[in-house]
Amino acid sequence: MTFLEEILAQKAVEVADMPLEKVAEKRKTYSFYEFLKANTSTMQLIAEVKRASPSKGEINMGVNPVLQAKSYQAAGAGMISVLTDPVFFKGSIEDLREVAKNVEIPVLCKDFIISEKQLIRARNAGATVVLLIISALTEEMLIALFEQALALDLEVLVEVHDQKELAVAQKIGAKLIGVNNRNLHTFEVDIAVSERLASDFSSDACFISESGFRTAEDVARVSQKYNAVLVGEALMREATPEAAAKSLKVTR
């Protein structure tokens, strides 16, 4: 069983037990897509709150998610990503709820979303952006969840890892497309994945390169074709996350 297969099997169990919440009022913040379109001179940062991962194990179990997120916001991050998967990443929807209450910028619910129940729960907790991972979904499920998310007035970050998935993301009209440098089956990371796929960008979407960034030099590798990078582990291991986040700022 690959990492992704194991995660999805567990996620199906989780979602079966998850209540269907009533849709509550949406948290007010700016559109991340509009923010990226308006701020093109610098590579923007999605900074992540992540306690652990399947490949690295514990990264920072003692983190205070609110303080971490506030450090990211102070450093100029355009959005905070919060892992809400409890089993493999040791996150929780409560982490997201607390972060969303304490920052002004958009918050991304980072999880393996397979059900509308998760979309509503994320919105009610304060997320205004949700992640849909193409490799975790059939195309039929992807389109259904994409449309449900838009109906809930959520922005959708559609994640791809290869040319075929990129073509699907562009075909369905995704405005935020994330290229994950991590192979979710093996969890191996290679920034060259983003470099390769950039030649196939054809839509008016904003493009985000995800995973593997530790230095400004790493970020510079993708700065010509991408609007933002998503960084988690490198920031979570730093004693001074605000300074670490600032050090990743690159002019485009």
Swiss-Prot record:
GO molecular function (one): indole-3-glycerol-phosphate synthase activity
Catalyzed reactions: 1-(2-carboxyphenylamino)-1-deoxy-D-ribulose 5-phosphate + H(+) = (1S,2R)-1-C-(indol-3-yl)glycerol 3-phosphate + CO2 + H2O
Pathway: Amino-acid biosynthesis; L-tryptophan biosynthesis; L-tryptophan from chorismate: step 4/5
Pfam families (alphabetical): IGPS
Record-listed E.C. numbers: 4.1.1.48
Alphabetized UniProt keyword annotations: Amino-acid biosynthesis, Aromatic amino acid biosynthesis, Decarboxylase, Lyase, Tryptophan biosynthesis
Protein name: Indole-3-glycerol phosphate synthase
Organism, as annotated: Listeria monocytogenes serotype 4b (strain CLIP80459)
